[in-house]
Amino acid sequence: MATSDSRSSPSSSDTEFADPNPSSDPETNSERVQSQLESMNLSQPSEVSDGSHTEFSGGGDDNDDEVASANGNEGGVSNGGLLREGVAGTSGGEVLLRAENPVEMEAGEEPPSPTSSGYDGERGSSGGATSTYKADDGSEDEIREANVDGDTASQHEAAWLPGKRHVDEDDASTSWRKRKKHFFILSNSGKPIYSRYGDEHKLAGFSATLQAIISFVENGGDRVNLVKAGNHQVVFLVKGPIYLVCISCTDETYEYLRGQLDLLYGQMILILTKSIDRCFEKNAKFDMTPLLGGTDAVFSSLVHSFSWNPATFLHAYTCLPLPYALRQATGTILQEVCASGVLFSLLMCRHKVVSLAGAQKASLHPDDLLLLSNFVMSSESFRTSESFSPICLPRYNAQAFLHAYVHFFDDDTYVILLTTRSDAFHHLKDCRVRLEAVLLKSNILSVVQRSIAEGGMRVEDVPIDRRRRSSTTNQEQDSPGPDISVGTGGPFGLWHFMYRSIYLDQYISSEFSPPVTSHRQQKSLYRAYQKLYASMHVKGLGPHKTQYRRDENYTLLCWVTPDFELYAAFDPLADKAMAIKICNQVCQRVKDVENEVFLQGASPFSW
């Protein structure tokens, strides 16, 4: 593994990699879009600094269900300037919060007794041998989940079995203690509300222990955020009378784990609204279980999405690739529906947006869209018949109910119509009938099905600029060896990329291609992206514009401009100069197809 100094100086970010046309005024961004894309020429390579960081090792990214390892441009897209070589490999330091009296187990110490509600998640198999994919070598001897082969057209959505698993486990079970990642929701009286693994009723004692820790710290006039115990992080989130806790040894950052708890809380609010607080004010021992009956599958589906859905940390949504004219026609139909008194109308295919429209001056946050689509996709009742259900959008208005009309046209495609009126079922049904007639007549539903089957962008589709390659690699052209621009993955070792449009709050993620084929490899890469994203957005340490990281698993490159963010993964032996050039090609490719992969003019989602 290559090692070198990974320090980043502010002067480097301000000079060498500064935007050619810096401007903090959003209106000027659109004026400089065209000029920024006129030239894709890069400066000559400067000194290379390979930021080698073991924190991106996939060794701790085995399946959460397995035994824990002990080692453990306005209206469009712009390039915002060219990425130049000489990227400093900055260290993305995690925020470490002080924990009072952290609990650690000494070497050789016996695990606590089953009655002590102890958590023994670090015992088990050790990490696999170092290789290109060390994350794929973890042990699966003791605990292994059923793995259902997913649809090849939707590689990002790993196989998920509806409902909670391992309901027979409790805190006395050895298997339960060895889970790598737990989520708990409980009330301020210690009553369990949700647990990722096991039966909530059997975990009442463990929930009471968590509640006691939180209350003890609060009684001292403080608030507990994070406790570190060995390889474990215990992350707490207090939302009034609701306590959320994550216990993890997956090496994810504190910020990301806390963000996951925020989403879990938002999912609960989507079902119940924040008015649930008043119930606890009247009765501190209020039992929420009856109100959340049958929603275990919703929470479990959301937890599962943390390992495959970039929307959970990018806070953006993704669209199904469609011809521009067809998407615009669909948007026109949905806008006509909104004109009849509907707040939001959305046509979705799985977790991807086909098109949407909203009432004037109404805005919808991507997190609300994520939670809403998860609620619909994980609830079997929505698939069997048209439904009219009260829901709450926590980022839109956490105090009020909206009413959602949901109808599935087929197994993947569905429409959501949101209204403030509780008596609008028949009106929304009439809107849906008219909408469906137009979609069938124009053959839109067939095109949607064909698009989801074909998948999204692929790294193999990224074009290679032969002129640029010839100007920098003349010696390679003269050599009799194989063409290094062609091989596994995309050009010059490109394995995967994610592109987020900041103005549109949308992202596009390439389909996984060899060698990133297994669920565990994909999961490991996403966690590397999460850490890279967190390190680029740490308050007080930026602003960072570029990062270049190399370890035994990947070469990771991140590029942030006022208009977009790009995250790319390359072969660990990829050449840095060529990786930077390929990133420019990716941005150009996204620009070329932006009308097909992004929803343009999505004013309801601009805030």
From Swiss-Prot:
Task: Tell me the InterPro entries matching this sequence.
Answer: FUZ/MON1/HPS1_longin_1, FUZ/MON1/HPS1_longin_2, FUZ/MON1/HPS1_longin_3, Mon1
Give me the Gene Ontology terms describing cellular component. Answer: endosome
Which key words tag this protein in UniProt? Endosome, Guanine-nucleotide releasing factor
Location relative to the cell: Endosome; Prevacuolar compartment
Coarsely, its chief localization is other
Region annotation (Disordered) ranges? 1-173, 463-486
Q: Does the keyword Transmembrane helix apply?
A: no
Q: Does the keyword Endoplasmic reticulum apply?
A: no
Q: In which tissues is it expressed?
A: Widely expressed at stable levels.
Compositional bias (Polar residues) spans? 21-55
GO biological process, alphabetically ordered: intracellular protein transport; late endosome to vacuole transport; plant organ development; protein targeting to vacuole; vacuole organization
Which GO MF term does the entry hold, naming one? guanyl-nucleotide exchange factor activity
Q: Which domain of life is it from?
A: Eukaryota
List all Low complexity biased stretches.
Answer: 1-14
What remark does the entry add?
Answer: Due to the stability of its transcription during plant development, this gene is proposed as a reference gene for transcript normalization.
What does this gene product do?
Plays an important role in membrane trafficking through the secretory apparatus. In complex with CCZ1, acts as a guanine exchange factor (GEF) for RABG3F of the Rab7 protein family. Promotes the exchange of GDP to GTP, converting RABG3F from an inactive GDP-bound form into an active GTP-bound form. The RABG3F active form is involved in protein trafficking from prevacuolar compartments (PVCs) to vacuoles. May serve as a linker between Rab5 and Rab7 protein families in PVCs and mediate PVC maturation.
Provide the assembly information.
Interacts with CCZ1A, CCZ1B and RABF2B.
Per the record, the similarity remark reads: Belongs to the MON1/SAND family.
Protein name as annotated: Vacuolar fusion protein MON1 homolog
Question: What are the top taxonomic ranks of the organism?
Answer: Eukaryota, Viridiplantae, Streptophyta, Embryophyta, Tracheophyta
**What gene codes for this chain?**
MON1
